């Protein structure tokens, strides 16, 4: 697990922030280590949808399909799109170099 890739985050005002991120970490971990606003209330345990992100189709298609548990949580996400994923479930790999990740302007945290 060595090496870094470029990840560009698009925040709700359209501003882009590009960071170098270590391969093997999740999008959720990268947002937290770079002071970007992505909640992750359940800390990556697939119990909420507050780390919902939107990907470009090119990169969405490079990921493994979401698990049933992730799809169940995505159903609760605010502003769901065809290329929505949970940031805690996207683990960075070399083929994701240059990925663009849109951070939604709002989240929905439903306590179960």
Swiss-Prot record:
The UniProt entry, under CDD domains, shows: fer2
Identify the residues that bind [2Fe-2S] cluster.
Answer: 42, 48, 51, 88
Record keywords:
2Fe-2S, Electron transport, Iron, Iron-sulfur, Metal-binding, Transport
User: Domain 2Fe-2S ferredoxin-type, which positions?
Assistant: 5-107
Requisite cofactors: [2Fe-2S] cluster
Q: Which GO BP terms, alphabetically?
A: P450-containing electron transport chain
An example of a GO molecular function for this protein is:
metal ion binding
Q: How is the cofactor bound here?
A: Binds 1 [2Fe-2S] cluster.
* Alphabetized InterPro entries for the sequence: 2Fe-2S_ferredoxin-like_sf, 2Fe-2S_ferredoxin-type, Adrenodoxin-like, Adrenodoxin_Fe-S_BS, Beta-grasp_dom_sf
**Role this protein plays:** Ferredoxin are iron-sulfur proteins that transfer electrons in a wide variety of metabolic reactions.
Q: Which family does it belong to?
A: Belongs to the adrenodoxin/putidaredoxin family.
Its name, as the record gives it, is 2Fe-2S ferredoxin
Species for this entry: Rickettsia felis (strain ATCC VR-1525 / URRWXCal2) (Rickettsia azadi)
